[in-house]
Amino acid sequence: WPFLLSDKVYRFNQPFTEKESNEKYLISLSFSQEKGLSVPAGFVSGQNIYNLFSELTIGFHDSIPFRDLPIPFACVSANMIDGKEVVMDKGRLPLAMRARMAIPGVFAPVTIDRMVLVDGGISNNFPVDVAKNMGAEITIGVDLSTGLKDEKGLDNIMGIVDQLTAFMGMKSYENNKAMVDLYMNPDLKGFTAASFTAEAIDTMIQRGERVARANWDKIMALKKQIGL
């Protein structure tokens, strides 16, 4: 995961000149005659994670309606040009997935149809309304947020970005939370979106199972309601 969430290239894939420069310099910046020296749009361009998404979605790279997938799918991004929410329910699946995770300042935005798209969390981070508009009669929402951070959680760029995202999407979040049929919020304090160690993953799975078991009667009631 550290490799996927970076712009690194495996050393054996690098030409000699690139290997040499990587050993000498800590950072690299773009330079062109038109723009001169330019600062990147994100700390990470996201090519490695996009390559992973492309590999995992082989067979669904053409422009398709996502509701025709084996499990209907949609995701939410935000257009940085006008600030509007963009529900991505068609197009190239790996590109939509990459746009959805373009955390501002961390991952570079994705440009699609003249829109500059970033993580939809700033506009709609709990999109129950999107699921209902797609035809979902019963919605079960698993909220992975851990609430607003205190001063200890705001000592790094990721914490600050998370807090800004939470503030910007607060109204939409509360509205969607109110309309979900079953709300579950596992305790993920102490973990971040980059917690990919085996120990962290096992702990988060256990906490998720604990919340599901605590809501077992409600889950069974919903199952009975839809006739299963």
Regions found by a protein language model. Name each.
Residues 1-228:
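Patatin-like phospholipase
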